[in-house]
């Protein structure tokens, strides 16, 4: 039992260590815009997104800045926060990215957790893939923050960047998701590193029918092994020459704008480990109780004999091959008279003759 509790304490320590580490995957900068993914899944709230960009000496980008980055090849397959919206920049249509739409795809339901996009005003123009080696505005803290660049290089720093207590100790679990993409690149996360496959980009093709806007809540299935999908909620995209805050792009095949499957909550890892330990403890307790009952619950046989009769021990076999159960036996031996019927007849005749003699004498 002591060994069990030692293992349980060790497991809880490992859970706490895993919660005290943050991995930040960063893409190249396109006109100062870049994508940041935390711990390989959608796990950044809107308040944390602003704090994270601030830690990188950046800000949340505006829609105009996103459109400018899109025009030079910035493309991902991940939802992320910008100023006032949750978007995906798309150049090439893909059924599992932005519901097969192109342009800056806007998700109208933005109450959950996503990735974030940041804008660094001091970044060089065009595409910049220089490795990020610092988190300049982070303050002191116990968290181990690891910055993973596109080329696999890492920068590790102890500190903290979150200012909202709910972001530090979230009350609701985050959702696991697929890996992120980057501008003009499709990426996949493996062991904390990001591998990129470049492909050529082309500017958006305008639609001959002019501006349009669609709205729909239809849902299309998506597979996790192919790329990111659209979280729950209706979404929309715009096309053509619209005002600031809408996207410019093309739509392929006239397909309706759709959103992906519902985001299902995931049980935290520490809760799974704790439940497993409790279940193991319960199983061990039941086994110990059953074993103790088998040892202490055996019955002994009681034999009462007056010494004149023979006692035959009987054993009853249990069902299904179980051990035979002891029986409590009380054997009573009655002593029978040893006189024979002839002896009884002789005694009666003697008494009768005595009575006759007495009568004759009288």
UniProtKB/Swiss-Prot annotation:
Pfam families named among the record's database cross-references: Xlink
Mod. after translation: Phosphorylated; activation of PKC results in the dephosphorylation of Ser-326 (constitutive phosphorylation site), and the phosphorylation of Ser-292.
Organism whose genome encodes this protein: Papio hamadryas
GO molecular function: cytokine receptor activity; hyaluronic acid binding
Keywords: Cell adhesion, Cell membrane, Cell projection, Disulfide bond, Glycoprotein, Membrane, Phosphoprotein, Proteoglycan, Receptor, Secreted, Signal, Transmembrane, Transmembrane helix
Residue ranges, Cytoplasmic side: 291-362
Region (Disordered): 160-186, 201-261
Name under which the protein is recorded: CD44 antigen
Annotated positions binding hyaluronan: 41, 78-79, 105
Taxonomy of the source species: Eukaryota, Metazoa, Chordata, Craniata, Vertebrata
